[in-house]
Amino acid sequence: MRIAHASVLAGLLMANACAVAISTSADNISRLERASAAKPESEAAQRTLGIAYFQANRFAEARAALDRAAAMDPRDGVVALYRGLTAEAENDVLGARSAYEAYLLYGTTRDVKAQIAERLVIIARKENELAAKEAIAREQQLARVPGSPRTVAVLPFKFTGRDTSLAPLERGFAELVATDLSRSAQLTVVERERIQALLDEITLQQTVGVEAGTGVRAGRLLQAGRIVGGTISQLDSNQLRADAFVTNVQTTATEGRGANDQEALDQLFTLEKNIVLRLFTDLGVVLTTAERNSIEQRPTRSLAAFLAYSRGLELQDEGLFDAASRSFDAAVRLDPTFSAAQQRSRDAKSAAAGARVSVRSVQSRLRGTREGAFVAAATQGGVSATNAGGGGEAFAIADGLNPSVAGGATSGSGVTPTQPQKDPSAGTGGDNVSTKTVTVTVVIHHP
């Protein structure tokens, strides 16, 4: 089983891109340092110096300058963006998330905001990996604090059988069980992504699934009181058997009688429903009528669509986001009403795009924008006194109308505007009156 730590690879891409992105000369940095020392209260001076340090791969100094700028103006979108890039370069995942989210609030360059939104998908994966590492580092401490018996982790099932095309059911079947268990208000089900990150970290994935009595370490690290695991067996070409067990993490004992059933392959969803209802009994959960009815919902009526979906989950776990999105898309083609596959496809596409985001690609999208002018100023050793706070839609439209204001963002051509690079009469995409309206109210006071 290949385990591709996509977010680690993506982080390396971001870090490597720093070395090939726009650089700032030592002379320019010295000039900016003098300007900052002369006006330590200037947010613009701190912002420009921080960007220059970042471009020179002097990340600790960049962080300090950008933090000072952010304290002076928390609404400065450019500062938020470069704080996020700096945090990623320093492997500060939480800091990167906070800064990127601030950029989504206050940034004005639409293309870059789209990139950062996609990048946050990768940041979320990195957060799960970080949490897994921290949990393992604190394992002895966590072992002394038992998880709540109402917190349940559903681990991948183990498939055995001749038809390897059914192997992705290890993930798909486990997700069905987790989804149905989460329909009870009495239980808290651990997110699948957290579980997978931990399994990767402690190499439980080597055995793929988790049978009764095993995986207790994973449950302890997840602070789950109980874990659910089991097997799916292909008895012949058309019959499946599922066995599932509830294990108490603290005592390592199996609770209840276990759940098992056997059905024809095309009755996979009936098989899962029978299993999960028995698991509720073993978990000591009495369902309400509404909860019982919701469990009867089926994600799809197409077995082929669900197999494609399960394969997508497998590929997603391996960090193969493009391939995963194709599998999810195949599931949607087989069943256009398969909403879970639609959502997973969107998520996989965002993750694939986010993994490709780099410092170079971000700065390329800044070229020719108002925000890009501040980057150009740092590159050339000049300080722009203009505030770079969030200007919202108005600034985004203005950037499209006359991008020459910031035409030197990455070209080194300066930041002083000359002639517009775009005929204002050509439109900007922001002049569609059906979607963007400006209201001017004139109040005249009578004498």
Regions found by a protein language model. Give the residues of each.
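C-terminal/domain-edge helix-coil "capping" segments
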Residues: 22-25, 105-107, 111-150, 250, ...
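Conserved structural position within tetratricopeptide repeats
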Residues: 34-37, 67-71, 104-105, 332-333
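Amphipathic beta-strand/beta-sheet edge segments enriched in Tyr/Trp
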Residues: 80, 91, 98-102, 209-283, ...
